[in-house]
Protein backbone atom coordinates (compact mmCIF):
# COMPACT_ATOMS: atom_id res chain seq x y z
CA UNK A 1 0.00 0.00 0.00
CA UNK A 2 1.34 3.45 -0.83
CA UNK A 3 0.48 6.70 0.88
CA UNK A 4 0.56 10.18 -0.54
CA UNK A 5 1.70 12.88 1.87
CA UNK A 6 -1.30 14.60 3.42
CA UNK A 7 0.40 18.00 3.26
CA UNK A 8 -0.06 18.01 -0.54
CA UNK A 9 -3.83 18.11 -0.20
CA UNK A 10 -6.27 20.79 0.84
CA UNK A 11 -8.62 19.31 3.42
CA UNK A 12 -7.32 15.74 3.21
CA UNK A 13 -5.66 13.83 6.05
CA UNK A 14 -4.47 11.00 3.77
CA UNK A 15 -4.91 9.26 0.43
CA UNK A 16 -3.92 5.59 0.05
CA UNK A 17 -3.65 3.48 -3.11
CA UNK A 18 -3.85 -0.32 -2.57
CA UNK A 19 -1.78 -1.19 -5.67
CA UNK A 20 0.13 1.15 -7.95
CA UNK A 21 -0.20 -0.88 -11.18
CA UNK A 22 -3.37 -2.25 -12.75
CA UNK A 23 -4.00 -4.11 -16.00
CA UNK A 24 -6.69 -4.50 -18.57
CA UNK A 25 -7.09 -7.89 -20.17
CA UNK A 26 -6.47 -11.25 -18.49
CA UNK A 27 -3.73 -10.15 -16.04
CA UNK A 28 -4.24 -9.27 -12.38
CA UNK A 29 -4.74 -6.93 -10.64
CA UNK A 30 -7.42 -5.19 -12.68
CA UNK A 31 -8.33 -2.70 -9.97
CA UNK A 32 -6.91 -0.59 -7.18
CA UNK A 33 -8.68 0.69 -4.09
CA UNK A 34 -8.36 4.40 -3.38
CA UNK A 35 -9.01 5.30 0.26
CA UNK A 36 -9.20 8.96 1.24
CA UNK A 37 -9.67 10.50 4.68
CA UNK A 38 -10.65 14.13 5.12
CA UNK A 39 -9.77 16.53 7.91
CA UNK A 40 -13.27 18.03 8.18
CA UNK A 41 -15.13 14.84 9.08
CA UNK A 42 -18.31 16.72 10.05
CA UNK A 43 -18.88 18.70 6.86
CA UNK A 44 -17.55 16.53 4.02
CA UNK A 45 -20.58 14.37 3.25
CA UNK A 46 -19.72 13.08 -0.21
CA UNK A 47 -16.72 12.65 -2.44
CA UNK A 48 -16.15 12.18 -6.15
CA UNK A 49 -13.11 11.16 -8.18
CA UNK A 50 -12.03 12.37 -11.61
CA UNK A 51 -9.64 10.38 -13.83
CA UNK A 52 -7.70 10.80 -17.06
CA UNK A 53 -4.81 9.00 -18.70
CA UNK A 54 -1.38 10.54 -19.24
CA UNK A 55 1.03 9.13 -21.83
CA UNK A 56 4.36 8.40 -20.12
CA UNK A 57 6.41 9.47 -23.16
CA UNK A 58 4.59 12.48 -24.60
CA UNK A 59 2.84 13.54 -21.34
CA UNK A 60 -0.30 14.17 -23.38
CA UNK A 61 -3.46 13.67 -21.33
CA UNK A 62 -6.90 12.43 -22.28
CA UNK A 63 -10.06 14.28 -21.30
CA UNK A 64 -11.25 13.87 -17.72
CA UNK A 65 -13.82 11.17 -16.98
CA UNK A 66 -17.16 12.30 -15.59
CA UNK A 67 -17.15 12.29 -11.78
CA UNK A 68 -17.33 8.87 -10.11
CA UNK A 69 -18.89 8.78 -6.64
CA UNK A 70 -16.83 7.29 -3.85
CA UNK A 71 -18.35 5.15 -1.10
CA UNK A 72 -18.75 6.80 2.32
CA UNK A 73 -17.26 4.47 4.96
CA UNK A 74 -18.03 6.86 7.83
CA UNK A 75 -15.76 9.01 9.96
CA UNK A 76 -14.58 11.06 7.00
CA UNK A 77 -13.24 8.07 5.05
CA UNK A 78 -14.25 7.35 1.45
CA UNK A 79 -13.23 4.50 -0.87
CA UNK A 80 -13.40 3.66 -4.56
CA UNK A 81 -12.54 0.41 -6.33
CA UNK A 82 -11.06 1.78 -9.56
CA UNK A 83 -11.04 -0.66 -12.47
CA UNK A 84 -9.29 -0.10 -15.79
CA UNK A 85 -12.68 -0.33 -17.49
CA UNK A 86 -13.90 2.70 -15.47
CA UNK A 87 -11.51 4.99 -17.34
CA UNK A 88 -12.33 6.42 -20.76
CA UNK A 89 -10.14 5.28 -23.67
CA UNK A 90 -8.18 2.79 -21.56
CA UNK A 91 -7.77 0.34 -24.49
CA UNK A 92 -5.98 2.93 -26.63
CA UNK A 93 -2.80 2.70 -24.55
CA UNK A 94 -0.34 0.00 -23.49
CA UNK A 95 1.40 1.78 -20.60
CA UNK A 96 0.09 5.05 -19.13
CA UNK A 97 -0.35 6.85 -15.85
CA UNK A 98 -3.79 7.25 -14.34
CA UNK A 99 -4.08 10.87 -13.28
CA UNK A 100 -6.71 11.63 -10.64
CA UNK A 101 -8.23 14.30 -8.46
CA UNK A 102 -10.56 13.76 -5.50
CA UNK A 103 -13.11 16.37 -4.44
CA UNK A 104 -15.05 16.33 -1.18
CA UNK A 105 -18.25 18.35 -0.83
CA UNK A 106 -20.72 19.37 1.86
CA UNK A 107 -24.47 18.64 1.90
CA UNK A 108 -25.14 21.56 -0.48
CA UNK A 109 -22.61 20.19 -2.96
CA UNK A 110 -20.04 22.92 -2.33
CA UNK A 111 -16.45 21.64 -2.74
CA UNK A 112 -14.62 21.96 0.58
CA UNK A 113 -11.73 19.51 0.13
CA UNK A 114 -9.72 18.93 -3.03
CA UNK A 115 -6.54 17.03 -3.79
CA UNK A 116 -3.97 18.28 -6.20
CA UNK A 117 -3.98 16.51 -9.54
CA UNK A 118 -1.92 13.37 -8.91
CA UNK A 119 -0.28 11.99 -12.05
CA UNK A 120 2.26 9.24 -11.50
CA UNK A 121 1.09 7.10 -8.58
CA UNK A 122 -0.99 4.58 -10.62
CA UNK A 123 0.14 2.85 -13.82
CA UNK A 124 -2.34 1.25 -16.24
CA UNK A 125 -0.96 -1.40 -18.60
CA UNK A 126 -2.25 -3.80 -21.23
CA UNK A 127 -1.84 -7.43 -20.23
CA UNK A 128 1.32 -8.66 -22.00
Where are these regions (language model features)?
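Glycan-association/targeting regions that enable binding to alpha-glucans and other polysaccharides
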Residues: 1-128
